[in-house]
Amino acid sequence: MRLDKILTLTGLTRSQARKAISAGRAQVAGQPVRDAAFLARPEEVTLDGTPMALPGEVTLMLHKPAGVLTATEDRRLPTVLDFVPDFLKNRGFGPVGRLDRDVTGLVLLTTDGQLAHRLISPRRRVEKVYLAQVESRPREEELEILRRGGVAFSDFVSLPAGAELTEEGLLRLTLTEGKYHEVKRLCAHIGHPVRSLKRLSIGGVELDPALAEGQCRPLTAEEEARLRAVAGL
């Protein structure tokens, strides 16, 4: 793995990692390395003499691609855990909630069971923001149906949701519950079936635009604090 990538896995930004490397602060197997593209194993790397290990509980943000299951294992299909770096795979990560197989965007993977439980608890009403491409352009009165809530399905009645159109004509939805296929069912209810769907944020933690699909990184200290505050921890 590239040296700069290893450093970013511990919470440094790409720019911070490269500056640290060029300053000679990173070592591989005890030797200073100033090449950001140098290939190394994470367990060989230190920064200012400190091993690049992630202590305690760890939460990753993943940019989930389409076609991937939000599950811990599957015999036939790729899962979100397949994208966890090899040197972290033994830490016991699990997904926080679920995204449908065809949905892309933010998935949180954590070793902290209490954090995961609180974030998905209906009582906490953690906000999740989605961006949907839907068939035809919804009218304002149709968006108002979503904002008011009270849409009755066989298994639940929807809570009030944020619903706005972007300049590109995409539907931005903010939900505080995690019912089965909720976004798709709400959009179909107002006559605008979903063509594609992406999750942008959970509990105020936004998907890093620098992450390509299939990439993940640990949360920054600020993101971690924000998420724990939302979870009441």
Language-model segment annotations:
Residues 1-233:
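Basic, flexible Lys/Arg- and Gly-enriched helix-loop patches that mediate nucleic-acid binding at interfaces
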